[in-house]
């Protein structure tokens, strides 16, 4: 990882003036993360290493001299927690985008791939990113599945699997520990997972959403050291005071004004404040940016630019145990980014390992896929579906009335109850209700599809289908029309996964994701165009806006580790009690009606 001994020896000689630099960057304004100063200096580079940071004009001996013309020189930006799969791009295409924005290192939790492919998914993440100019630190996913007993993914990870992955040099720690319930209640599986991380000496990421007081203290006592699931400014401060590294994330921008205001009340900004993207869809990554977009939002909300940059550089390097990164200093890796202004950060030039890789938002040379690495395909072994597969039935009565539990809301769900009419054993959808349908897609059991009532999305006009749904990534369809639901699902089965919208017997939009059912092999610009089109057209199917929130809700609607009801491939689950719940409360038979014109599926 660090420069070899020969390069380091050459750097020592160049720093002393005994030999020339390979590259000399002159007329820079150094953004000093150690002192907070902005100071004029030149930077001499040997190989991939910074050899010297010295007064302007004091050295001219170099094989190449490049003027930065007064630009602000910062260490390369670092993303301390990202699910790269949320970009729906393979690693090399993702790297091509974020490198041009100034991000030179990421900590990748590939638990989406792992939930589909098991340990082989993590191996693919390692092998596909090892050759990249982007520094990719892979984490060993702890949440496969995120909630054992409530869902089935493509694998089950416990202590043995974690020990295997943590033994790989490219794996830098344990990824976010999402099973908070298991940690707090001492489940054997979670004790094994956390202990494997402690034994490895590598970092252990947290997912402490909603934890406070004694439960938060207990979570830290177990060995977890970070959290990116901040819910408010008070939550951020409590977690800082508890000793967690907080990772301010860009996927929840509505929290940023209050978090910045709270941080500005502190007498000292700790090195335990970092930044992450967590999840960024492809069009937003390409058009607005990843970490760079988050830093600009923090600056807009009043955080000094030097502090924002420190969160993404020195603080991130400390957090990720990368002592070769994070500062512009002799002996550090020459991963650097040049900005023309600190009021709005736009990367003018990006250097990785001393080589200029990007200029004015353009990569100077393409990045090839990893040689000899075959992306995993054919991960939806599901036979074609029929409209009859998308009918909600009540067992035990043919005609009558049933009282059912259902899911209310989208991302933050609540339990609801509703009385429905039953005709020929089929539920007549009430006004304002739609269906959510989930089918296991990993071939580990022959489960019948699960189906439940959904309220709070309006009456879906058609269907939305996805094979990318946290965290088990089973096949999920939402809709009100059984024919459209089957059409959208079959489109994904045929393409190997992705997302699709159907309405009135036609596919409105479709993004194919044939790699593990979650990554596309399209060029980034074309994928972004298709994804944007699909998201915009979703407003024709779902009533609520903005469309971005629709897709966040779709992707998280089966996340059984969160509080409230969720539908998984095993049934209707309760995140609080960790139980699978029968949706049927009561039913009674009534005389068969004479009017048979009602639509049993609500289609």
UniProtKB/Swiss-Prot annotation:
Please indicate if the UniProt record lists Cytoplasm as a keyword.
Answer: no
Q: Name one Pfam family in it.
A: Adenine_deam_C
EC assignment: the record states: 3.5.4.2
Q: List the disulfide bonds.
A: none
Keyword annotations for this protein, in alphabetical order, are: Hydrolase, Manganese
Q: Which GO terms describe its biological process?
A: adenine catabolic process
What name has this protein been given in UniProt? Answer: Adenine deaminase
- Give the organism's phylogenetic lineage: Bacteria, Pseudomonadati, Pseudomonadota, Gammaproteobacteria, Enterobacterales
